[in-house]
Amino acid sequence: MNKSIAPATSVVAGNVKFGNALPLSVIAGPCQLESRAHALEVASALKEIATRLGIGLVYKTSFDKANRTSAASARGLGLDAALPIFAEIRDHLGLPVLTDVHENEQCARAAEAVDILQIPAFLCRQTDLLLAAAATGRIVNVKKGQFLAPWDMGNVVSKITHAGNAKVLVTERGVSFGYNTLVSDMRALPIMAKTTGAPVIFDATHSVQQPGGKGTSSGGEREYVPVLARAAVAVGVAGVFIETHPDPDHAPSDGPNMVPLREFEALIKTLMEFDALAKKRSTVGAV
């Protein structure tokens, strides 16, 4: 282990650069990998939007939703089916790809086809999983647990950097506030930036989730996604994480949180305007 390494202040996935003082980048896509056709449809649409707006975009989706509320809930296609789809999106569409991993042995295999490995919020303190992800050399995006203080992410990031990987992102996705409720404390964004030294991402869609709020599945209040996204970008962040879907109300998971694809471009355009204003008046590394 290398105990002297510090997290990079900016990281590059494909042609997308993340840095707290750099122009805003986006991580976007559907919650769950539903099929090859669906993934390519959404990825192609997102690439067109990103090209029109001139913003860096990483495509995200999950091959396995391993922490669903109910055992009967759809979980995804699985890693074996997902790998060639991830590779096709990355290699033929030219979009960097992010997916989450839940077990140590998934890390090396997923890293063959994606640019960013994501550690789910519930697993953010699992040392062996963090080390396995770090060992791949890929960028590691760690979701801050709903139970964790923002300053505690310094210890999480140090596990990755001590393994010799400086390419880390940290993501705020809300904090538990009573039962089935999350709130967003915007102070967490500059605190995490200062504590970790890593680029900070704001997850605007999971922050409006109501965990387990529908009994056998999670609810959500997607109407507040633009509100929280604007607030976070006004504070100043490296990127926003926004799940989007052509028909969220019929999505197999997290539909109540996801932004309809038809509304995505207008939202990102607004966020870019907020970002330009926030970073124009900010000093370098202010967040």
Swiss-Prot record:
Its main location: cytoplasm. It catalyses: D-arabinose 5-phosphate + phosphoenolpyruvate + H2O = 3-deoxy-alpha-D-manno-2-octulosonate-8-phosphate + phosphate. GO terms for biological process: keto-3-deoxy-D-manno-octulosonic acid biosynthetic process. Keywords: Cytoplasm, Lipopolysaccharide biosynthesis, Transferase. GO terms for molecular function: 3-deoxy-8-phosphooctulonate synthase activity. It is found in: Cytoplasm. Pathway: Carbohydrate biosynthesis; 3-deoxy-D-manno-octulosonate biosynthesis; 3-deoxy-D-manno-octulosonate from D-ribulose 5-phosphate: step 2/3; Bacterial outer membrane biogenesis; lipopolysaccharide biosynthesis. It comes from the Bacteria. Its EC number is 2.5.1.55. GO terms for cellular component: cytoplasm. Disulfide bonds: none annotated. Belongs to the KdsA family. PANTHER family: PHOSPHO-2-DEHYDRO-3-DEOXYHEPTONATE ALDOLASE. NCBIfam families: KDO8P_synth, PRK05198.1. This is 2-dehydro-3-deoxyphosphooctonate aldolase. It comes from Rhodopseudomonas palustris (strain TIE-1). The lineage of its organism: Bacteria, Pseudomonadati, Pseudomonadota, Alphaproteobacteria, Hyphomicrobiales.
